[in-house]
A protein has these predicted regions:
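Conserved catalytic-core motifs of GNAT/GCN5-like acyltransferases
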Residues: 114-116, 128, 133-145
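Short acidic/polar active-site loop segments enriched in Thr and Asp
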Residues: 75, 111, 133
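Conserved GNAT acetyl-CoA-binding A-motif
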Residues: 105-118
């Protein structure tokens, strides 16, 4: 994509995404130890169990953006993934995906959306710009061994 040009993209709200483009996008974005390493069956399961999945496709039908959230459907949700292909960054696609994700969850009656693991000043600025704010509490995690 040429610098300075806004891409013409199609956003889609659907869990029916083939696993191969999802893996390719995560690999291109440098997530090699995460979803890029998952099997097609694991990716299908991830999609199926997500509350909401948004994808962005370029005119060549290549997956260039992906956002997903998990939720209880009532009280809160969690941004699970937000990935934009490196060639499509800094053009507003991440903002569009996150705003649509948050807006859809709000329209579904889910009043609270969390985003965890936000690292670095650019990421924090990005999430603040889209309406998120930092919480002043500890977050605990239990990892399977």
């Amino acid at each position: 994509m040429k610098p300075g040009r806004r891409p013409i993209l199609r956003l889609q709200n659907s869990k029916r995404v083939p696993p191969a483009p999802v893996r390719a996008l995560f690999r291109a974005a440098g997530w090699t130890e995460d979803i890029a390493a998952y099997s097609p069956a694991q990716i299908r399961k991830l999609l199926r169990h997500s509350h909401l999945v948004l994808t962005a496709w370029n005119p060549k039908q290549e997956l260039v953006g992906f956002a997903s959230a998990v939720s209880d459907g009532v009280l809160c949700g969690l941004v699970q993934n937000l990935v934009v292909h490196p060639r499509y960054r800094r053009h507003g696609l991440g903002t569009r995906l996150l705003r649509q994700l948050a807006g859809t969850m709000t329209r579904q009656g889910i009043p609270c959306l969390y985003a965890l693991g936000i690292r670095g000043p650019r990421a924090r600025t990005f999430f603040r710009r889209v309406g998120f704010h930092p919480l002043r509490w500890d977050v605990f995690v239990r990892l399977a061994r």
